[in-house]
Regions:
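C-terminal accessory extensions/subdomains outside the catalytic/core fold
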Residues: 718-741
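Short, solvent-exposed positions on alpha-helices
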Residues: 627, 678-682
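Terminal, compositionally biased segments used for targeting/anchoring and flexible tails
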Residues: 643-658, 686, 708-712, 733, ...
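Short active-site loop/helix that positions an aromatic residue
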Residues: 273-274
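Short, charged, amphipathic alpha-helical segments
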Residues: 681-689
Length: 741
């Protein structure tokens, strides 16, 4: 099979991985008719862990598929369909390691404390798997995310529920006013290709190299910033008191998954401040059992189980005393007593803030009811945009999905741009002093005063991605005849340099008749919301973090979920990366499958990505059959939405597997109805007839398995045979698809 007719479909984690077992056989059968090979690559958390230890695993070793796809992404042949994957926190990583060890893989434990070189090596390998380790490797291009018309029209006809807003809502965002990254940012543009060094000159005269060498290119922007531990602690102490005084829930919204170095540290400091009385009282024993603040209070509950019962009870009683004295915390699961401060990866800002805004600005309390909430987002860089949304909702009420406009996004993300590429240049500082960034000649580029415990970070943004981003923004503005707003803050050093580049590169394009503006994020948000409420569309052109935040915020308001977005990454070397929506991997869906054999994951994102992938392949390699498949898949998706065949949430109704059957039925019918390719018409006419005649039988077979627990042999690494059996319970459907192949 020639390389050009190949689509790579990624195996990932949790709900999308389970859905793949049902959908992929259908996709393989349909695409084979156009001489397209669909191959899989495993970039799941379990797969990435196993690929990190080939020496230890011997014959059980597996290839490093992520590295392979990273190499592929910089070639013109790349055509990758990327499903959501876990961005692992430390507790998730440890759970996955434990599961794999139980399955017979000779993996080393995750070393929590590091003393030997071997432990350092093991820890470094595992840490590479943590956080958002996948997307930066594959995203060798910028981001084009938008709601397809069929999806937008469906949302207007079938609006999701939006909570009403009260004008006197006490919900608000709390952010630092000094001592944060925003207030300390410095930026420089690199004149010629070089390498820079990051070193800490401590007050005691010692120098510690934090990072020996970071290669930089001509025209690249590098920036540094510091978040003060002292300022963070005094800020959170004041906000805890204020939440108590106002009688609102206290919640914390970070991104400990992607920002895997900085945000767990911030989370840990908030845990330390909130529980300080109990933690101080039991400091010695908590240190002995290895409690790590950065892993959340859930880590404490897990570790005290090893203590004698009376000691355990005493610590638990003192924690309960903290809850009695402190403001109520927002809950992740009020039935199970899991708070916002239990696990750093449970509340992720880009998903949690839209959910709060959609729920009238409220979050769940211990009583299982919704309450007004103080949302703590410590750093000012992006916190203020959410406050602007809250103020808009307070003044104008909830958004109306039946009338609101759309906010597509063009996002700068190629080459690990901005904060999302900063992890290997982020450090918790060990001693008071000055962190200096110097070039290869020892010339000082930037310096930051620091104190022990502070978080220092350096970000990089290369010039070619900025040029490509500006071009993509102009192209989308023209193609959709929509205003495009660059969200850039002139008060941020980094953004100031980006503004100069944007203004220069816009001159390289014909912008006549286009409405392209540069606005500070809060102003851009107000402008966009005003247009949105009038039913008007506005393209947001943003950096990497706002790309992430806004492509959750607006789709959740417009469509009820970000998983229904068309998410295309036109790779800079000519290939295509097609992301299935902009959401996560839905662990609660897996829980429901295991308990009730019912998977409510909606594969609409996969359908949209596959259609875009087929179109790209058809255009790039002049494959007319691929174009017919793409066009008919779009038609089938429209019919799928119109006929309301998306998964429901409750047993006894259609779930993910049933939705795949209906997609196959409608796709086959669309292929049978088209006249562009008579061979495809004949081939799929028979399948369409078989599926239509057996609809009742297939639906009955799919639904018959629901309502009882199912064993798939693992969570992070489910057994392929058991999972396939669970996800393909209709023999009639399986036989029809097998016949097509």
């Amino acid at each position: 099979m020639p390389t050009r007719s190949k689509i790579i479909y990624t195996f990932t984690d949790e709900a999308p991985a389970l859905a793949t077992y049902s959908l992929l056989p259908i996709v393989e059968a349909f695409t084979a008719s156009a001489d397209i090979a669909v191959e899989t690559r495993d970039i799941s958390l379990a797969g990435r862990i196993l690929a990190s230890f080939p020496e230890q695993l011997g014959t059980k070793a597996i290839p490093d598929h992520l590295a392979e796809l990273g190499d592929l992404a910089v070639t013109p042949e790349a055509n990758i369909i990327k499903l959501p994957n876990i961005s692992a926190s430390t507790p998730q990583l440890q759970a996955a390691i434990k599961e794999l060890q139980a399955q017979g893989y000779a993996l080393p434990d995750y070393p929590e404390t590091v003393t030997t070189d071997a432990e350092k090596e093991t820890r470094a390998r595992y840490d590479k798997v943590k956080g958002s380790a996948v997307n930066p490797v594959l995203r060798e291009g910028n981001s084009d995310r938008r709601a397809p018309l069929s999806v937008k029209n469906y949302a207007r006809k079938h609006p999701h529920k939006m909570g009403a807003w009260a004008a006197d809502s006490k919900s608000h965002i709390a952010h630092m006013n000094n001592g944060d990254f925003y207030g300390s940012e410095k930026a420089v543009q690199i004149e010629a290709a070089d390498a820079v060094k990051i070193a800490l000159a401590a007050k005691d005269g010692t120098t510690t190299v934090l990072k020996e060498k970071t290669n930089v290119q001509a025209g690249e922007i590098i920036d540094t910033a510091v978040l003060s531990k002292k300022a963070l602690r005094s800020f959170i102490a004041a906000e805890i008191e204020d939440a108590k005084k106002q009688g609102v829930l206290l919640s914390v919204h970070l991104k400990a998954t992607m920002m895997k170095v900085s945000d767990p540290i911030m989370f840990g400091q908030i845990v330390a401040e909130f529980y300080k009385d109990a933690l101080a009282k039991h400091a010695t024993v908590l240190e002995q059992i290895g409690f790590n603040l950065n892993n959340g209070i859930g880590d404490l509950y897990a570790r005290i189980k090893a203590l004698p019962a009376d000691q355990q009870a005493q610590i638990e009683a003192d924690i309960q005393a903290v809850y009695a004295a402190r403001p109520a915390l927002a809950m992740v699961n009020s039935d199970k007593g899991i708070t916002n401060l239990h696990v750093p990866s449970d509340v992720i800002v880009d998903a949690s803030m839209p959910a709060m805004i959609r729920d009238s600005g409220k979050m769940w309390g211990t009583d299982g009811q919704l309450h007004d909430t103080k949302a703590v987002i410590p750093d000012r860089c992006y916190a203020t945009i959410y406050q602007a949304v809250i103020e808009d909702c307070r003044a104008n009420g909830a958004f109306d999905p039946t009338t609101m406009g759309s906010v597509p996004n063009v996002g700068l993300m190629a080459k690990k741009a901005e904060e999302y590429g900063s992890h290997d240049k982020t450090f918790q500082i060990k001693a008071d002093g000055v962190v200096r960034v110097t070039d290869s000649q020892g010339n000082l580029l930037m310096e930051q005063n620091v104190e022990a415990g502070d978080i220092f970070r350096m970000c990089q943004t290369k010039d070619a991605p900025i040029q490509d981003w500006v071009k993509l923004a102009v192209n989308r503005a023209r193609a959709s005849n929509t205003p495009a707003i660059f969200w850039l803050d002139p008060k941020r050093a980094h953004d100031g340099v980006v503004v100069e580049k944007v203004q220069a590169y816009l001159k390289d394009h014909n912008t006549e008749g286009l409405d392209i503006r540069i606005m500070a994020p809060v102003d851009a948000m107000k402008f966009t919301l005003e247009r949105t409420r009038k039913g008007l569309d506005t393209i947001s052109v943003t950096g990497n973090v706002l790309r992430d935040y806004l492509t959750d915020l607006f789709p959740i308001m417009e469509l009820g979920t970000s998983a229904k977005m068309l998410s295309i990454v036109p790779l800079m070397n000519g290939g295509g990366l097609f992301e299935t929506g902009a959401g996560g991997s839905a662990p609660k869906h897996v829980q429901q499958l295991l308990e009730e054999n019912f998977l409510r994951w909606d594969s609409l994102g996969e359908f949209l990505a596959l259609a875009a992938s087929l179109e790209h392949l058809g255009v790039t390699y002049n494959n007319p059959k691929a174009l017919v498949l793409s066009k008919t898949l779009d038609q089938a998706t429209g019919q799928f939405l119109d006929n309301n065949k998306s998964p429901s949430r409750k047993v006894g109704n259609i779930d993910n597997r049933g939705s795949h059957f209906y997609l196959a039925l409608y796709w086959a019918q669309a292929l049978a109805a088209q006249a562009e390719d008579t061979a495809l018409q004949a081939q799929f006419g028979e399948l369409a007839k078989t599926l239509a005649e057996n609809e009742a039988t297939i639906v009955a077979e799919l639904n018959a398995v629901q309502g009882k627990p199912v064993d798939i042999g693992g969570y992070y690494a489910p057994n392929p045979e058991l999972t396939s059996k669970a996800m393909r319970p209709s023999n009639t459907l399986n036989a029809a698809i097998a016949k097509l192949k």
